[in-house]
Amino acid sequence: YKRCHKKGGHCFPKTVICLPPSSDFGKMDCRWKWKCCKKGSVNNA
């Protein structure tokens, strides 16, 4: 999210958010999402 990026950027690790299948294939719609970290919570890695 843009707000998250402004508040402190992205942090590792990534998390997978899966949504219910929206097609006839029946596959879960999984997308990589960055965990939101507060500013100064993690050193530059």
UniProtKB/Swiss-Prot annotation:
Tissue expression per record: Expressed by the venom gland.
Swiss-Prot/TrEMBL GO biological process terms: envenomation resulting in occlusion of the pore of voltage-gated potassium channel in another organism
GO cellular component: extracellular region
Pfam families cross-referenced by the UniProt entry: Myotoxins
Disulfide partners: 4-36, 11-30, 18-37
UniProt xrefs under InterPro entries: Myo_ane_neurotoxin_sf (IPR023355), Myotoxin (IPR000881)
Keywords: Antimicrobial, Disulfide bond, Ion channel impairing toxin, Myotoxin, Neurotoxin, Potassium channel impairing toxin, Secreted, Toxin, Voltage-gated potassium channel impairing toxin
UniProt GO MF annotations: potassium channel regulator activity; toxin activity
Subcellular location field: Secreted
Top-rank lineage group of the source organism: Eukaryota
Family: Belongs to the crotamine-myotoxin family.
Function: Cationic peptide that possesses multiple functions. It acts as a cell-penetrating peptide (CPP), and as a potent voltage-gated potassium channel (Kv) inhibitor. It exhibits antimicrobial activities, hind limb paralysis, and severe muscle necrosis by a non-enzymatic mechanism.
Assembly: Monomer.
Protein name, UniProt field: Myotoxin-3
